[in-house]
């Protein structure tokens, strides 16, 4: 028995550059982008971001195969395999936020599942069930070109984000789970005695380097242009925020 399924779900269009009723100021946003491109060129970098104007989407491809085999009247064997490939794009803008294309990221999750079972009957009072399974999961975020995250607030009544999304610059999780279980059941009168074992082996690889290429946050366009033009007041004290809920983070506001 086999099965294949494909699903694609487009969702409403985000607000983009020049969108009507958007709270951010598109003209000021373009000035900020032009200043960043000019700064990159002066540093010898070829960096040309563009404004994002994409639909949000969710896609998935699924496939499965199952085989049942009656070996004989005392033994039955089954094996099944399933596969799920799911994708969705995140990091889109809103009515009050405008982002570049490399701020968007695609979250992709691929899962393979393999399971096998052997049922054996040795006598009217003695039977055995053996099971094995393997689950392979690969979760990954696909980010844009290597570039820092630059966020400027109070651009009109919204904010502008240029560069990569801070938590997607290096983010991935690999999981491999092996399971073996065997149960021998002995029927004795009105009683059933089960002797067995259950074993699981896990392997995880987690990549998470937030703000790998750097992150810069500005309270206003004027603060941003002051830094770019070298006219910022260096006597200001930087503010920090530290939190601890399972992890610690530190952010600097310029």
Task: Provide a role label for each language-model segment.
Residues 3, 16-19, 36-46, 141, ...:
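Glycine-centered secondary-structure boundary/capping sites
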């Amino acid at each position: 028995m086999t099965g294949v399924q494909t699903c694609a779900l487009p969702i409403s269009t985000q607000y983009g550059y020049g969108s009507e009723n958007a709270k951010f100021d598109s003209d000021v946003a373009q000035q900020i982008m032009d200043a960043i491109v000019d700064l990159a060129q002066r540093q010898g970098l070829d960096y040309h971001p563009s404004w994002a104007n994409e639909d949000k989407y969710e896609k998935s491809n699924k496939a499965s195969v199952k085989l049942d085999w009656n070996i004989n009247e005392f033994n039955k064997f089954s094996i099944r395999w399933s596969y799920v490939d799911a994708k969705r794009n995140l990091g889109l803008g809103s009515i009050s936020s405008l982002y570049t294309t490399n701020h968007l990221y695609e979250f992709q999750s691929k899962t393979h599942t393999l399971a096998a079972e052997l049922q054996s009957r040795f006598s009217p009072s003695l039977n055995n069930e053996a099971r094995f399974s393997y689950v392979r999961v690969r979760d990954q975020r696909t980010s844009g070109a290597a570039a820092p995250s630059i966020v400027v607030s109070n651009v009109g009544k919204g904010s502008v984000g240029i560069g990569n999304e801070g938590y997607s610059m290096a983010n991935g999780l690999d999981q491999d789970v092996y399971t073996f279980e065997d149960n021998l059941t002995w029927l004795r009168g009105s009683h059933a005695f089960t002797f067995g074992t259950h074993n699981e082996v896990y392997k995880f690889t987690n990549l998470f380097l937030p703000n790998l290429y750097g992150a810069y946050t500005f309270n206003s366009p004027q603060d941003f242009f002051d830094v770019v033009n070298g006219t910022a007041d260096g006597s200001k004290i930087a503010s920090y925020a530290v939190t601890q809920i399972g992890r610690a983070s530190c952010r600097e506001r310029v």
